[in-house]
From Swiss-Prot:
Keywords: Cell membrane, Endoplasmic reticulum, Lipid-binding, Membrane, Phosphoprotein, Transmembrane, Transmembrane helix. It is found in: Endoplasmic reticulum membrane; Cell membrane. Residues 33-56 are annotated as: Disordered. SMART domains: GRAM (SM00568). Participates in the organization ofendoplasmic reticulum-plasma membrane contact sites (EPCS) with pleiotropic functions including STIM1 recruitment and calcium homeostasis. Constitutive tether that co-localize with ESYT2/3 tethers at endoplasmic reticulum-plasma membrane contact sites in a phosphatidylinositol lipid-dependent manner. Pre-marks the subset of phosphtidylinositol 4,5-biphosphate (PI(4,5)P2)-enriched EPCS destined for the store operated calcium entry pathway (SOCE). Its main location: endoplasmic reticulum. This is GRAM domain-containing protein 2A. Residues 74-141 form the GRAM domain.
Length: 320
């Protein structure tokens, strides 16, 4: 019996050893399979997804802008058939042309033309302005309060005022790029160049000898005249200056521009003061109207009370 028990114990011990031997390699292989799995996983980086999303949004934005531009270009050439097909619309803005009535429509800006289209009671109203004919572009305030307008003056003294512009500054910048023959005369206007470019001024070394020669020639001419002529005034030195075109020093134009820019803030301050005074007057008138209406309402209520008291106090008529 003891031998059998020992035999069973040895067999159990051997079986346990075999089981442990089989389980050990399995446990050693498990982390090896897990590690490469962790290494193969891509890093959780949100920047890649964000960049892909931003690229998609940019592509959508550009595609929308391209479709809108092509759509406006087709509308532009459909409405204004006299404009050549080579003209491409640079900007389209919704605005209103100020006339007897406000004509709401769209302003089409192209490299050589400024075109406005509006429809009133089924009738098309079109305005075509060549860029070359524009002489002045000035920022305009609607009713002297709302800074949402632009005034365009042509060489035929025709003035067009466009108001209700949502982005007046962007339209102004676009017109400044298109109208290359204009220059900024102030912060709020573009005007044509009043002083054309003069020829290069001659050096004083060339002018001074010529002036001396003229003076020398004028002196003997006055001596050779007959005595019958009593008095002949000599040619003044200023006459030599009149022979030459007036040339301003190079810094004079810069000084004039500085003076114009200094005068502009003063006019802005005057306009602001005038606007503030106007607002004060309007506010006082509104207060006066409110007080007068409240006083009239009070008087009406008192009269109603008096009428009610009189009607209750009077005796009722008896039936005969």
């Amino acid at each position: 019996m003891q031998m059998k028990m020992m035999f069973f114990c040895l067999s159990d011990w051997q079986s346990n050893q075999q089981m442990h031997g089989k389980m050990a390699p399995l446990k050693s292989h498990v982390p090896c399979t897990e590690k490469p799995g962790k290494v193969q996983e891509p890093p959780d980086d949100g920047s890649l997804h964000w960049s892909e999303g931003s690229k998609g949004e940019d592509i959508k934005k550009y595609s929308r802008e391209g479709t809108l531009r092509s759509k406006y270009n087709q509308q532009y050439h459909k409405l204004f058939k006299d404009i050549p097909l080579e003209e491409v619309v640079l900007k389209v803005c919704s605005c209103a042309l100020q006339r007897d009535l406000l004509l709401h429509g769209r302003l089409y800006i192209s490299p050589n033309w400024l075109c406005f289209h509006a429809s009133l009671f089924g009738k098309d109203i079109k305005v075509v302005i060549p860029v070359v004919s524009v002489q002045l572009i000035k920022k305009h305030k609607m009713a002297r309060l709302l800074p949402n307008g632009l005034a365009i003056t042509t060489n035929t003294s025709q003035k067009y005022v466009f108001v209700s512009l949502l982005s007046r500054d962007s339209v102004y910048d676009m017109l400044r790029r298109v109208c290359t023959h204009l220059q900024p005369s102030s912060k709020k206007s573009l005007s044509i160049r009043k002083f054309p470019e003069e020829a290069e001024c001659e050096s004083p070394e060339v002018l001074i000898p010529e002036m001396k020669w003229r003076k020398a020639c004028s002196a003997p001419a006055s001596l050779s005249l007959p005595d019958s002529i009593s008095c002949i005034s000599q040619i003044p030195t200023d006459s030599t200056d009149s022979c030459f075109p007036s040339r301003k020093p190079p810094g004079s134009e810069a000084v004039c521009e500085k003076d114009a820019l200094e005068e502009e803030p003063s006019t802005d301050q005057e306009l602001r003061l005038w606007d503030s005074r106007l607002l004060k007057v309007i506010f006082v008138m509104i207060c006066f109207l409110v007080l007068s209406s409240s006083y009239l309402a009070f008087r009406i209520s008192r009269l109603e009370q008096q009428l009610c008291s009189l009607s209750w106090g009077s005796p009722l008529p008896r039936d005969r």
